């Protein structure tokens, strides 16, 4: 895609008015645009307006809209150039397409306390044989995964990751899938810092000690408040303890995932991760982990192995809120640091 020059505010407003009547909730392709959309400024503005409608985006004034359009256009150029390469994944115009990578990182990334902290938990999955593992695991198909949620601009990924694992093990042990409260962890888990970051095993320790309420009783607010756990009525879900997967090994993590959903961490700050739309993601990314997610399965597609990850950025990101990250065989930190820090709840 050839870069289209920036336009003046007056021209931008004029074109916006011209195309306004024709904009509707279009049926976007899987990546959110077609090559025809790249042929003129008018088509780009129409695409931008359609994208705004699809993602319920509103801007305070024309200056802000023009600023976001320029970022959108730059991201679209990056998406198109990336998708022309022979990758196993593709990018698209998701919810974050009007954010620069710096803005995206400030709002959604870096919400982990140092994930290299070593904890003295049970290490049940150490150097176990992978020969007898099932070829594919998907805990969604077994009814152990609740719908994808959105953490908003609160740095609470650690709470979402932990809660998803507790929901999973509770379903496996009791046969009941219930949605649990991330907000309780944001408000009440004292070693973490609410919307300013946390650490999944601390959250899992909290649940083992105190239990956790239903999401309907303690709903998510995307901001830290006063702990209300003692005032909230209704049932709670409790676990028995916390387990740790020995890090930096594919087999250990696969063994753990085969038994239950697992909290994992990744480096998510890169532009490809921000704009990921589908396929098996293989980078580029580093291993300085900054975001907690949940491994809910694994498998192979087109001969490539992957770990199935549930994220907390809503269903408009990735594969309806999920990402498949390429497996790295043997001993390594894994793609995007996926094997570096993995924990799970235990429940008798």
Curated annotation (Swiss-Prot):
Q: Which residues form the propeptide?
A: 17-132
User: What residues form the membrane-spanning segments?
Assistant: none
Q: Which residues form the signal peptide?
A: 1-16
Bridged cysteine pairs (disulfide):
154-195, 188-227, 285-336
Q: Which reaction does it catalyse?
A: Hydrolysis of proteins with broad specificity for peptide bonds, similar to those of papain and chymopapain
> Which residues bind E64 per the record?
157
Q: What is its EC number?
A: 3.4.22.30
InterPro entries noted in UniProt: Papain-like_cys_pep_sf, Pept_asp_AS, Pept_cys_AS, Pept_his_AS, Peptidase_C1A, Peptidase_C1A_C, Peptidase_C1A_papain-like, Prot_inhib_I29
Q: Which GO terms describe its molecular function?
A: cysteine-type peptidase activity
Q: What are the glycosylated positions? A: 86
Q: Which residues does the Swiss-Prot or TrEMBL record annotate as the active site?
A: 157, 291, 311
Sorted keywords for this record are: Disulfide bond, Glycoprotein, Hydrolase, Protease, Signal, Thiol protease, Zymogen
Q: Which CDD domains match?
A: Peptidase_C1A
GO terms, biological process:
proteolysis
* One Pfam family it belongs to: Inhibitor_I29
Q: How is its activity regulated?
A: Repressed by the active-site-directed cysteine protease inhibitor E64 (L-trans-epoxysuccinyl-leucylamide-(4-guanido)-butane) produced by Aspergillus japonicus.
The family note in this entry says: Belongs to the peptidase C1 family.
Q: Give the PANTHER family listed for this entry.
A: CYSTEINE PROTEASE FAMILY C1-RELATED
* Role played: Cysteine proteinase with a high level of diversity in substrate specificity.
Q: Quaternary form?
A: Monomer.
| Protein name from the UniProt record | Caricain
Species classification:
Eukaryota, Viridiplantae, Streptophyta, Embryophyta, Tracheophyta
